[in-house]
Regions:
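N-terminal hydrophobic/helix-forming segments and targeting peptides
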Residues: 1-439
Length: 439
């Protein structure tokens, strides 16, 4: 089992390193699915589905949904929902700023709830989507500048004697990255054009995000922790995909759903508040010749795991967690509860996931926020507003959430992969007498 943890987390680290943002998450997972025999569907074309077929569809190049059809008379849907975006700096248009005729820095803005100080004094680069005018047609091309390209330098303590007493960082004035000397003006545009195989004049628009170039790795005396950028939520993405690829579909349709823009509220066409999941489930139903009544019945026999990482007890701040429900790295998948419904877990869905975990021999931990702290939000309750199915919020316990370099447990990646595999193989049936059966 230790070897399995080691191998799996080596793959996780490689996935983190080649996935700087949501566009590359979709690209990389598409490649894995295609290699495994999945057929790509288009939202702007009719779907032709068959029993035993394996399919995937994407939206905006930054959200993806994959599924397998076990049989035409399937019972329901087993939906694993996660998100592929992470807090980062986004590059503004007209980004170059020349300082004192000596430096070139870049104008950026915050995406999501960032820990700003963690972005200082690290090698950074830029990746994302570039829209190019090629013979009158707009083409989207993905770009990842795989070099140590820029850095946001700290102000020396000699010029800021109060630095260790707490400094408030301003995103507009303190956090603009230095990319080169004044002699390199317009250099980024030229670099992007070269990467896209076009001229600088052919670049029409961009969606580019900064990312930390430090490779993901394992740390600890026994290498028991994994550290890297974007563990929230790519650890759940990776583990869920492993379970999805390994599972054999049972009586329900296994659905792997990876959404975008969770870190900024999910209110986009590719986010949890949109109809991407709902549209796909309805189209599966229609393509197999089932009617609206069949669809509603299948929803009643469905279950969703909303997978988004959770807060581990911090060794230097143990008072920040709940008094009786504490979560730690390497001690199992976290099940989240919230009285104000920020998390979707209720007694029914919580009991179902406990039965599922017991069957898969996967340990669970329970998470509540402190009663005097609001905590963060996630995508589960937003998704179920569009698709009303039983849902449970889960995740993996991590430290340094929303840092440029995060930390979690190596065992937990395997625990979630095993739970996801069992989940995708299972089916949930709700009887007329109000009882539930996990098949």
């Amino acid at each position: 089992m230790e070897m399995a943890y080691t191998e799996l987390n080596a793959k996780l680290c490689a996935f983190l390193d080649r996935t700087p943002n949501s566009f590359f998450a979709v690209k990389n997972i598409k490649e894995e699915l295609a290699a495994a025999g999945f057929a790509e569907l288009q939202e702007n074309s009719r779907w032709q589905l068959q029993e035993g077929g394996k399919y995937y569809v994407s939206r905006n190049g930054s959200a993806l949904l994959a599924f397998v059809i076990p049989q035409k008379d399937y019972l329901g849907f087993q939906v694993y929902a996660c998100h592929c975006d992470s807090p980062a700096f986004k590059l503004k248009n007209n980004a170059e700023i020349v300082v004192d005729k000596k430096y070139v820095k870049l104008n950026v803005e915050k995406y999501g709830g960032m820990l700003l100080n963690t972005w200082l004094d690290r090698p950074l680069s830029v990746a994302g989507r570039v829209l190019c005018n090629v013979d009158g047609r707009l083409e989207a091309r993905l770009v990842n500048v795989e070099q140590d390209l820029m850095m946001i330098p700290n102000l020396a303590i000699h010029m800021n004697r109060e630095a260790n007493e707490g400094v408030k960082l301003n995103a507009q004035t303190d956090m603009l990255p230095l990319i080169g000397s004044a002699a390199t003006k317009d250099g980024l545009q030229k670099l992007l054009a070269e990467a896209c195989g076009v001229t600088a004049e052919q670049i029409v628009d961009t969606e580019l995000f900064l990312y930390n170039r430090m490779p993901a790795t394992t740390v600890g005396l026994e290498q028991e922790y994994v550290a890297g950028g974007r563990l929230d939520d790519l650890q759940c993405v990776f583990a869920g995909l492993q379970g999805f690829m390994a599972a054999e579909a049972g009586e329900s349709v296994p659905v792997f759903c990876m959404l975008d823009n969770e870190e900024v509220g999910s209110g986009t066409k590719q986010g949890a508040a949109a109809t991407f999941l709902k549209d796909a489930l309805q189209r599966i139903n229609m393509a197999l010749g089932r009617d609206e009544e069949d669809y509603l019945v299948s929803l009643a026999n469905s279950l969703m795991l909303s997978a988004d990482n959770a807060h581990a007890v911090h060794p230097n701040h143990t008072d920040k967690n709940d008094l009786t429900n504490k979560t730690y790295p390497n001690e199992g998948v976290v099940v989240k509860y919230s009285a104000n419904q920020k998390y979707t877990t209720d007694a029914v869905s919580g009991a179902l996931v406990q039965l599922l975990a017991k069957k898969a021999n996967v340990p669970l931990q329970l998470f509540y926020n402190r009663s005097d702290m609001a905590g963060g939000s996630t995508l589960g309750n937003i998704s179920t507003a569009q698709v009303a199915i039983k849902s449970v919020d889960i995740g993996l316990a991590q430290l340094a959430m929303h840092s440029a370099y995060e930390m979690a447990g190596v065992k937990d990646t395997a625990y979630l992969a095993e739970l996801a595999q069992a989940f995708f193989t299972a089916a949930v049936a709700e009887a007329a007498d109000g009882t539930y059966c996990l098949k």
